[in-house]
């Protein structure tokens, strides 16, 4: 499976693009690491690639099909830097998880998710506990590409290592493509098969 971005441009103000003519082509076995300065639209780009935001111009294609026209579960899933922004605070975790694709028990175990957490509301979980849920939700059975936007910030160092060990094993077994956005060069050295510094009009 191939994920492509063709001529992606986007801006929040009319006539001003923070992303301009962005190009990407990657296969599902690749792990792409992205480093970029603040203000270069990293999170916005992630949201476009995951189908949350439509670009001003250009297309995101999954095996040639327009991602933004797909219905149902999106095969490109995003894990947000701030997990509280990706959940409904009025729903219990069991209801939030039920909105997505089926999650296998081994994923819950691999991420160290306690079953009684399902009965809690997002505000009753720590940032790290909520982030684990969001990672599990993104690893539904139909996921083909995973976008991780600074996902380690809510986790302590030991938990970071455990989570990344599990994630790398899971995506290798399932042949899931991975895009990692981070400020940590050592993390990318460990994880990525390709690394890029995001600059204006870069082609990946």
PLM regions: where:
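Hydrophobic anchor residue at the start of the ABC signature
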Residues: 135, 147, 163
């Amino acid at each position: 499976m191939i994920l492509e971005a063709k001529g992606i441009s986007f801006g929040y103000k009319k006539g001003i693009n923070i992303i301009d003519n962005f190009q990407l082509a990657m296969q599902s076995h690749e792990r792409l690491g992205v480093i970029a300065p603040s203000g270069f639209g990293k999170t916005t780009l992630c949201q476009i690639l995951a189908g949350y935001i439509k670009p001003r111009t250009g297309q995101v294609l999954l095996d040639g099909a327009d991602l933004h026209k797909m219905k149902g579960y999106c095969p490109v899933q995003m894990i947000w830097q701030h997990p509280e922004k990706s959940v409904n605070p009025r729903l219990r975790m069991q209801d939030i998880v039920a909105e997505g694709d089926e999650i296998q028990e081994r994923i819950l175990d691999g991420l160290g998710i306690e079953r009684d957490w399902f009965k809690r509301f997002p505000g009753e979980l720590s940032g790290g506990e909520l982030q684990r849920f969001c990672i599990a939700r993104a690893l539904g059975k139909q996921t083909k590409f995973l976008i991780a936007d600074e996902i380690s910030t809510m986790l302590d160092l030991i938990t970071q290592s455990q989570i990344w060990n599990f994630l790398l094993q899971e995506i290798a077994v399932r042949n899931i493509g991975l895009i990692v956005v981070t400020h940590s060069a050592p993390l990318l050295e460990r994880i990525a098969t390709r690394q890029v510094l995001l600059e204006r009009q870069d082609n990946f």
